[in-house]
Amino acid sequence: MSNTVKIVRFHKTGPAEVLQFDELPLPEPGPNEVRLRVKALGLNRAEIMFRNGQYLETPVSPSKNGYEAAGIIDATGADVDTSWVGKTVSTVPGTFKLNDHGVYGEVAVVPFHGIAEYPSTLSYEQGASIWMQYLTAYGALIWLGQVAKGDFVVITAASSSVGIAAIEIVKVEGAISICVTRTAAKKAELLKQGADHVIVTDEEDLVARVNEITSGKGARIVFDPIGGKILESLAAATAPKGIIFEYGALAPEPTPYPLFTALAKYLTIRAYTVFELTPDPVFPKAKQYIFDHLASGAFKPLIDKTFHFAEIVDAHRYMESNAQIGKIVVIL
């Protein structure tokens, strides 16, 4: 193995072009860490926001980036059983900081508690397309929302990897998904992925369609990463005593709180991220739930497009185009 490796870092915040390949000494894992020889990277919207300096974590220059990698463990630090060397694993978002352990690179050093095995039937590309989407959806819909058979669940940004995961979880739990997308271009694919209903907001009134689908009852759960002005419409479409999960802030404008609607219907409007789930005692149960459904084939990571490692800037640009349905993956 070479004494140096290529690691993607950025030395200032900004557009995709700030990402650069830095040739660095091969890093050694510290106590309770492992090193992966990376085979695939799964991109997430959080990494775009981090690169832009608009994320929950502030970049420390020069900063690493990347939450999700799949690969083979080739070294272990102190306090980690060496029998893990040679095993195929993927990294789990929410268990480490991007500044400390960002995984964009030929190798990645991450905490031992930040890895997980996945079914051997999955490819490296699929292995890098699991934990952010399914854990995020599980935490809101199952852990906190307690989705039940027959519930109506509104899923905005439904063509994202998290949105697709939410569709799958809603289906296996016997609930009914109402997926929201801006244009008709993605409607057919969302239906193919298992959406029960699709609302195209450029052509249809969101509140009217939800009321039509639910026979006027509204949705018990709303799962939204957008915020902004759509929150008022989502509140209007939510059933009395329903819950709205805000798990992102994709809208560039402020998010007004729909006070009167919330008061009138006793709504819960709740902020949530995967970082709330990962330290909780339910975390192992969440991972097992996801593993089991991946193994059974009920969950199947949808990969929209793959890029080579040298094209990671193009991969970031593609994510920002919002053309994808599912996961964008970088292969090494």
Predicted segments, located by residue:
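Short, glycine/polar-rich helix-capping loops at beta-to-alpha or helix-loop-helix junctions
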Residues: Y104, R182-E189, P254-L259
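N-terminal Rossmann-like NAD(P) cofactor-binding module of classical short-chain dehydrogenase/reductase
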Residues: V154, V222-F223, F245
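Mid-domain Rossmann-like dinucleotide-binding core that forms the NAD(H)/NADP(H) cofactor-binding site
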Residues: W84, A128-E204
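Glycine-rich phosphate-binding loop and adjacent beta-alpha segment
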Residues: E173, K229-F299, I331-L332
